[in-house]
Amino acid sequence: MNLVPMVVEQTGRGERAYDIYSRLLKERIIFVTGPIEDEMASLIVAQLVFLEAEDPEKDISMYINSPGGVVTAGLSIYDTMQYIKPNVATLCLGQAASMGSLLLCAGAPGMRCALPNSRVMIHQPSGGFRGQATDIEIHAREILEIKRRLNEIFVRHTGKSLEEIESSMERDNFMIAEKARDFGIIDKVIEKRIEEK
């Protein structure tokens, strides 16, 4: 059972209760928590588009703690992050694995961060299919195409060569926050929030 805390806010019109995630959305903070699948991706995309409509000039923060998930669901979030006008700052807390790591590195340049004890994991896509030989061949070609596209995205956002990305993603590749920074997935490891003046 998931309990979502409520926050009570005093306004000129009395008290207003929000669930914590809705209140944080008001502050332009989106959470990507848990496995990335279609329903969750749809909610994240809707939040990104809503925040763009609210103020296309103001940055959005995306907090990521995800083991990864469905590639097409993750790519719908990725494409929306690239499509909307506001910069999306990404922050890894806990883990950003698989598709979670792709979303982490897709943040705006200079705005991709991780907390010191978080971990990042990159790898090639996996899948399985049963059926007729021709259908298996079609799906094998498709997963190789997905692998190529994901590699190109990591090349674009990390600055690494295609060869470096391919060899680094051959197997599960776990990184502590500092290693993820050195690899180009994030820009900095942060321990404390920097106060804006």
From Swiss-Prot:
Keywords, comma-separated and alphabetical: Cytoplasm, Hydrolase, Protease, Serine protease
Residues making up the signal peptide according to the UniProt record: none
PROSITE patterns: CLP_PROTEASE_HIS, CLP_PROTEASE_SER
Gene3D superfamilies, per database record: 2-enoyl-CoA Hydratase, Chain A, domain 1 (3.90.226.10)
CDD domains: S14_ClpP_2 (cd07017)
EC top class named in words: hydrolase
GO biological process: protein quality control for misfolded or incompletely synthesized proteins
Catalytic reaction(s) noted: Hydrolysis of proteins to small peptides in the presence of ATP and magnesium. alpha-casein is the usual test substrate. In the absence of ATP, only oligopeptides shorter than five residues are hydrolyzed (such as succinyl-Leu-Tyr-|-NHMec, and Leu-Tyr-Leu-|-Tyr-Trp, in which cleavage of the -Tyr-|-Leu- and -Tyr-|-Trp bonds also occurs)
Record keyword Hydrolase present: yes
One Pfam match: CLP_protease
SUPFAM superfamilies: ClpP/crotonase
Superkingdom to which the source organism belongs: Bacteria
Function: Cleaves peptides in various proteins in a process that requires ATP hydrolysis. Has a chymotrypsin-like activity. Plays a major role in the degradation of misfolded proteins.
Assembly notes: Fourteen ClpP subunits assemble into 2 heptameric rings which stack back to back to give a disk-like structure with a central cavity, resembling the structure of eukaryotic proteasomes.
Name used for this protein in its record: ATP-dependent Clp protease proteolytic subunit
Organism: Anaplasma phagocytophilum (strain HZ)
